[in-house]
């Protein structure tokens, strides 16, 4: 849980770019994530990470902590809406969720309308991020995850051989180059956590 909260804090350092429907929470040098008008320890970028984590944990309910251990599958699967709606206030993620997986990657029922042009993919996740920062009780940013087992799981990303094929090469330098391309494309599109391939699956009972 602490690692998860620390990641949220790291993501929050970039959250200023998401200013939108609740501009009053964006202060000079910090964000009022819990909308109480006070700079709490977890909202103070200059405070030690451990202190910020402890402060945030102390303010979280059991339900909020539980949701920070859950994945919401995006792109029209579990997450049926392409963008936040009023109904989100009544959903299980109304006060946050750990991560949304494969959002706006061109797969699922929304298809390529959200994945290309690339700006559509980025803006979709930024809009969703604004909702979590501005509309949830503690404003904990969401982690946008994606698969990276044969390149980034995005219909316009570079595709590589399947993970078994990569592992069969026994070529560490080549795998490193594949990982570098995957990482650069994921970063450019705003994905913050990528699942790596299982290269030894043929030998793993």
Residue ranges and their predicted role:
Residues 2-8:
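Sec-dependent signal peptide recognition
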Residues 3, 15, 199-200:
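Short, intrinsically disordered/low-complexity patches at protein termini
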């Amino acid at each position: 849980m602490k690692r998860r909260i620390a990641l949220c804090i790291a993501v929050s350092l970039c959250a200023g770019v998401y200013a939108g429907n609740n501009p009053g929470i964006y202060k000079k040098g910090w964000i009022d994530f819990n909308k109480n008008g006070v700079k709490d320890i977890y909202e103070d970028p200059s405070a030690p990470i451990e202190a910020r984590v402890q402060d945030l944990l102390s303010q979280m309910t059991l339900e909020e902590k539980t949701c920070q251990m859950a994945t919401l599958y995006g792109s029209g699967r579990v997450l049926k809406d392409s963008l936040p709606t009023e109904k989100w206030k009544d959903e299980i993620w109304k006060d946050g969720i750990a991560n949304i997986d494969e959002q706006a990657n061109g797969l699922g029922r929304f298809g390529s309308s959200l994945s290309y042009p690339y700006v559509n993919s980025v803006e979709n996740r930024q809009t969703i991020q604004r909702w979590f920062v501005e509309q949830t009780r503690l404003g904990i940013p969401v982690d946008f995850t994606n698969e990276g087992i044969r390149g980034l799981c995005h219909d316009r990303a570079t595709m590589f051989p399947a993970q078994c094929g990569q592992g069969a090469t026994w070529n560490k330098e080549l795998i490193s180059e594949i990982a570098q391309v995957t990482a650069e494309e994921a970063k450019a599109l705003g994905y913050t956590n990528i699942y790596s391939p299982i290269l030894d699956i043929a030998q793993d009972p």
